[in-house]
Amino acid sequence: MGTMIVDSGISVDNADPEVQEQKTSLHSSRSRLKGTVQVVEFVIGDELFAVDLFDTREVITTPEVTSIPNAPTFITGMIDLRGVITIIIDLRIMMNIAKESSGKKKSRIIVLDKTVSDKMIGILVDDVYSVTNYSKEDIDQEAHSSAEGHRDILGVIRKSKKDAEGKEKSSLVIWLDIRKMIGRIEKDL
């Protein structure tokens, strides 16, 4: 599967939906065998989140967004993305995250794959960090399951990296079930 950079972001080649579905299915099978997961990592407020790479199409810088009258508060508006009207959802509002990002604001839109919804949808986030592979051993899929209201979380990823001094630093990345989240609000779109 080819990936390319678009507007300082990531794009997954989706020329033919049927071929893309076969590629996604094939890759998912390979990932399960290898025991790895590919995610797009992003930040909202000061928290790290991730969505499955194959639920995304591309990442773009935030263009001017046209408001939609009487839309739910989490719908920021719509954009014209190369001739296709794309609805923009503010994930901060949808997930009730009040805290603003403490870093420089470089908001991005993650455009979701056509397999996620019948409509073209983009999710507004504070910044996109990377596309990362994680071993399934790095993912805790049980920690969140007992908590009420966490049905949109696929797991919690333990991310380790070395800081400038060479010390091991770890953080948690919340792996979102973006398909379930969009499915729940699709009637409002």
Report each predicted region and the residues it spans.
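An acidic, low-aromatic, low-complexity terminal/linker signal
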Residues: 1-189
